[in-house]
């Protein structure tokens, strides 16, 4: 964001002019979008535990074989690993959302994750379903009008949803 401000100021300075109303309006819109983004990510981060918990409950209600003897989330150790992985994916989705770019999610979280799950015998479709459940919970929290700066947040919510979709597709 500071780069955009610096660029606009440098351009005006090079021309020896004050910032124009169009430039100021553009910067103002960028700040408003940034505030919405900060609010949405703050809401997700503040509710991360409940997002992961509700997604896991929904997943295990839908796929009870995962928590039955022989299931991939059976035993406390495996359940803890499952919840940890869901939390890590949520954390990297929040990084992507604040940056407005999926590269941190791709590079540091998703790259090689499918192969890791395959090597461990973890069903990718179940992981993807869990990610989709997290998406539903996170979007509900982030889109709550008491958590986000007033204004249309549909594009931001669609962007955040796309990061979850990207994560689900990477492990499926």
From Swiss-Prot:
GO terms for biological process: photosynthesis. Keywords: Antenna complex, Bile pigment, Chloroplast, Chromophore, Electron transport, Membrane, Methylation, Photosynthesis, Phycobilisome, Plastid, Thylakoid, Transport. Disulfide bonds: none annotated. Contains two covalently linked bilin chromophores. The modification N4-methylasparagine is found at residue 72. It is a peripheral membrane protein. InterPro entries: Globin-like_sf, Phycobilisome_asu/bsu, Phycobilisome_asu/bsu_sf, Phycocyanin_b. Light-harvesting photosynthetic bile pigment-protein from the phycobiliprotein complex (phycobilisome, PBS). Phycocyanin is the major phycobiliprotein in the PBS rod. Belongs to the phycobiliprotein family. This is C-phycocyanin beta chain. It comes from Rhodella violacea. The lineage of its organism: Eukaryota, Rhodophyta, Rhodellophyceae, Rhodellales, Rhodellaceae. The gene is cpcB.
């Amino acid at each position: 964001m500071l780069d955009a401000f610096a660029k606009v100021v440098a351009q005006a300075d090079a021309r020896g002019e004050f910032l124009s109303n169009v430039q100021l309006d553009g910067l103002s819109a960028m700040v408003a979008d940034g505030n919405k983004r900060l609010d949405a990510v703050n809401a997700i981060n503040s509710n991360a535990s409940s997002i992961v918990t509700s997604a896991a409950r929904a997943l295990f209600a839908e796929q009870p074989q995962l928590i039955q003897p022989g299931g991939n989330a059976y035993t406390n150790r495996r359940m803890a690993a499952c919840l940890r992985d869901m939390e890590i994916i949520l954390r990297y989705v929040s990084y992507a959302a604040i940056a407005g770019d999926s590269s941190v999610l791709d590079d540091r979280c998703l790259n090689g994750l499918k192969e890791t799950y395959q090597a461990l015998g973890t069903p990718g479709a179940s992981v993807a379903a869990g990610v989709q459940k997290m998406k539903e919970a996170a979007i509900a929290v982030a889109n709550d009008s008491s958590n986000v700066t007033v204004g249309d947040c549909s594009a931001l919510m669609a962007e955040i949803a796309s990061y979850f979709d990207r994560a689900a597709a990477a492990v499926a």
